[in-house]
Each structure stands twice: as C-alpha cells, then as structure tokens.
Regions:
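Catalytic cores of secreted or luminal carbohydrate-active enzymes
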Residues: 326-375
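Aromatic-lined carbohydrate-binding/catalytic grooves of carbohydrate-active enzymes
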Residues: 61-122, 126-204
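Bacterial N-terminal signal peptides
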Residues: 10-19
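Glycan-recognition surfaces
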Residues: 161-163, 174-183, 230-343
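C-terminal beta-sandwich/jelly-roll accessory domains of carbohydrate-active enzymes
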Residues: 396-398, 402-462
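Structural recognition of the beta-strand scaffold that forms the well-ordered cores
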Residues: 35-40, 70-75, 80, 129-134, ...
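Carbohydrate-binding surface patches
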Residues: 331-334, 339-341, 375-422
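Sec/Tat signal peptide C-region and signal peptidase I cleavage site
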Residues: 21-25
Length: 462
C-alpha cells in the first residue's frame, strides 16, 4: 500500500467517524438497533403461565423471528402465588436469600430450584431471548424475616430503606445506596444470570419516583455478572433532564406513563398516555435516540388483549386499523423499541401484517437523523435518513417521510420538498406500507382520513 493511498484511507475513516452522530459505545454492541420483542403485561397481567408463555414464544419463532423479533419477556407477578386476588391479599414466593422465585404452580420446572433457567433454555432453543420484569427494591417479607443476602455478610434489614417503598406497588422496600444495598442487587443479578436471562425490565425506577442510585446499583450488578443483559427502565415519563444519566446505565427507558389503546384522553386513567399525546413526547425525545440507548414509547397494544390484560377488560384493541398503522409508523420513524403487547397466539391476518412488513421494520432498525419537521394540532410530518449510521460508518439510501393526520377530520396535506428540508426538485416515492412505487413527484401531497398516516421512502437523483 502506498503512503498516499494509506493517507487517503485514514482521511476517509476520520471523516466518517466525525460525521456520525453520538453513540453509547458501552451499550451499542448489546443493542445496536432498537430491541424488538413481546411482553406479557398487555394480555396476561400478572397471571401468565409457562404453557401460555411457551405458546407465544412458539408463535414468535414461527412467524416473527425472521423479521427481527427476538425478546420474550414475562412481566410483573411471576412470583405472586395468588395473582387473581386483590393486590392487598397477594402472597409471594421468596427464598432464604430474600429473592423472589417463580411460582411452581404456574411454572412447573421451577419446582426443583432451577428457577427460570429451563424456560430460558427453551426460549433460546427457538433462537429467541428471554426476559423478566422486576420491581426495584427488596421484598418486604425478606426484611421482616431479616434474611441473609447471598454472597455477603449483610442481611435484608441492612439493605432496605423502609422509608422509600414504591408509592404504587407494595411488594418491596427501596434499597439503600450502600454496600448492603449493592450486595442485594448483586445477588439478584447473579441469580438472573444463572437463569440465562437476557433482558431485565426494572419498574418503579425511571419515574414516580426517579431512583438514580438504584439504577446505578442495578447496572453495576448486571455488569459484574459478565452476562449481557439488556436493562429496560420503567415507568415513564423519564424526565428529559435525566436523559444523559439514564443512557449511561440502561439500554432503553420509558418516555411516557403506561400507554394503552386510546387515541385521546382515557377517562378511567387520566395519567395514561394517549396516541395523540405520544407525538409531542416522541418529538422531544428524538434527539436522544442513539445506538445502545433507546427512548421507549411503551408496548404496542395490538390485536387481542386477553385473557387478563394488565388494565381494563378482555378485548380486541380499541384502535381502528388506521390508528394501529399510525402507531406502528410513529414508533418506527421515532426508532422506539418495538415490544408487542397483544396475545400472539390470537393474532389475526391484519395484526400479523403490521408486524411483518420488512420495509417498515427497516425504518425502525436502520435509519438515522429521525426528527419531526412539521407539527401542528392536526398534522405531523417526520423525516429520517434511510440507511445505517454506526460508530465508524454511514450509508445513505434516501429519506423516509411519515405524514400523519392527527386531526379528527379528513384532510389533504401538501408541502413542497423544501418545506421538509429536501433540496431536489423531484423525488421518486415508494409507499412502504403498501409496498408499491408511486412514481416521481415535484411535491408531497397526501389525502388522509382522521388519525391515518403514510410512510414513504423518497429518493432523488443518484
């Protein structure tokens, strides 16, 4: 190689490095793209059994895995002995080290002390990954009995902060920012690693209240195990001012309170995030999206929500088909993690089509510079570059444009390309949902029904 040729390569490499957006190098290898998977809460609440979980895992492996879906996550309550009772009457399975264990009556292979390892191994045999949900802190029962913390000289009472229980969940006390507190988090992370867990969703930690000390302790404990485990923080809304902090320790974090299947405000829960509200929230968080750290717009309540949804009655999603497609489009152009909430086994042809469109999934997994370029009370337009942007490289495959009618009446939306920051006079348009080419256009004009949307790939001259 000549010196001139070598210097040119170095110059190209430096340009590519400087041109790329910031990335979380410590976590980028674990989650270089937004995680995609399924969570049990929206359909099963605290009641899911091993048989039900396996059935959903089998369905994912058969129908979704080839499109990039991989995480199978058991949400809250796997340690609750009587999940269909009132929460005040719950009884828990806690071992002699003060750690929650899965209930054998719902997860039979755990009866011999194997914990979730047999189930995780089953999920892995399908080519998928296994995750579970925890509430921050230490079980109250462990503190009452002052159980020894495994691998340390401390006991539960040493670690517990009795003044800092989760205000909306009575299972645990908080954990002190101390050697004893760290020892407890070390013990549960070690346990989960021994079960071959790949994903931990930690709740009552990202907001109401925000617990940065416990986030740091949990992240440190996970790192000590040596096992790669995604850390997902919940609930939201994570405060924007905490973005740089949470991104140091977690791979994803919730940007809103619980998201359910309603376009506007929900009378039952005024705190529940609506799809309409999610547009403004996503726009604020878009600058913080980066490989290794993904603002999370919450689960996708699609299809059949049952038999025991985490909130409300058994139902088919309340979203219209237009709203379902709009939700998938917003999550994708924003690059949120994609975590399905509906029962997979019950998925119909329409729901399956939303989850298996490779061109839409590519927007979520392989785009960059994602941002809202036009926002009014009734219209939202998002723009992103098509291709990949990593630590040392960037590819350019045109632009993605998402146009949303977020108003309550039909409208025609028109913009010149320059309104969107695009410089060429004419662009070739491809409709990603319909998977068809629409030809060349000198401007953008879309007629949309209420709450409907389109997602386009636009390419200029090459």
């Amino acid at each position: 190689m000549t010196r001139r040729y070598s210097s040119r390569l170095i110059a190209v490499w430096l340009f590519a490095l400087l041109a790329c957006p910031p990335t979380k190098a410590g976590n980028a290898a674990l989650t270089p793209t937004p995680p995609m998977g399924w969570n049990s809460w929206d359909s099963y609440g605290r009641t899911i059994t091993e048989a039900q979980f396996k059935a959903n895992a089998d369905w994912m492996a058969a129908h979704l895995k080839r499109f990039g879906w991989q995480y199978m996550v058991i949400d809250e309550g796997w340690y609750v002995l009587n999940p269909e009772s009132a929460p005040k009457d719950y009884k828990f399975l806690v071992n002699d080290s003060g750690q929650f264990l899965p209930v054998p009556s719902r997860f039979p292979p755990t009866a011999n002390g194997a914990g979730f390892k047999p189930l995780a191994d089953y999920v892995h045999s399908l080519g998928l990954k296994f995750g579970l949900h925890i509430i921050r802190g230490i079980p109250r029962e462990a503190v009452a009995k002052n159980l020894a913390i495994e691998g340390s000289s401390y006991h539960a009472a040493d670690a517990a902060d009795r003044s800092d229980a989760c205000p909306w969940n009575a299972y645990n006390y908080g954990v002190k920012s101390s050697e004893a507190g760290q020892a407890y988090y070390d013990s549960i992370a070690k346990l989960y690693a021994s079960w071959n867990v790949d994903f931990i969703k930690a709740d009552c930690i990202a907001d109401h209240p925000y617990k940065p000390e416990e986030i740091r302790m949990l992240a440190s404990a996970i790192k000590k195990t040596g096992r790669p485990m995604v850390l997902s923080l919940s609930p939201g809304p994570t405060a924007l001012e905490n973005a740089s902090e949470v991104s140091k320790y977690a791979e994803m974090w919730r940007i809103c309170d619980d998201f359910w299947d309603h376009w506007g405000p929900w009378e039952k829960h005024d705190w529940s995030q609506s799809l309409y509200q999610q547009f403004a929230t996503a726009a604020k968080w878009a600058p913080h999206v980066a490989p290794g750290g993904w603002p999370d717009a919450d689960m996708l309540p699609l299809g059949h929500l049952g038999p025991h949804p985490g909130d409300g009655v058994l139902r088919e999603t309340r979203f219209t088909k237009d709203e379902q497609r709009t939700m998938m489009t917003l999550w994708s152009i924003f690059r949120s993690p994609l975590i399905i909430g509906g029962d997979l086994v019950s998925a119909d042809e329409w729901t399956t089509s939303l989850l298996t469109n490779p061109e839409v999934i590519a927007v979520d997994q392989h785009s960059y510079e994602n941002r809202a370029v036009i926002t009014t009370d009734t219209v939202a337009v998002w723009l992103a570059r098509g291709g990949d942007s990593g630590v040392y490289y960037r590819t350019d495959q045109g632009h993605y444009i998402a146009v949303f009618n977020i108003g309550d009446s039909e409208q025609t939306i028109h913009h010149d390309w320059k309104d969107l920051g695009l410089t060429e006079k004419s662009y070739k348009i491809r409709d990603l949902w319909e998977r068809e080419n629409l030809g060349n256009a000198q401007s953008l004009t879309v007629k949309l029904k209420p709450h409907a949307s389109v997602l386009y790939l636009v390419q200029g001259k090459r």
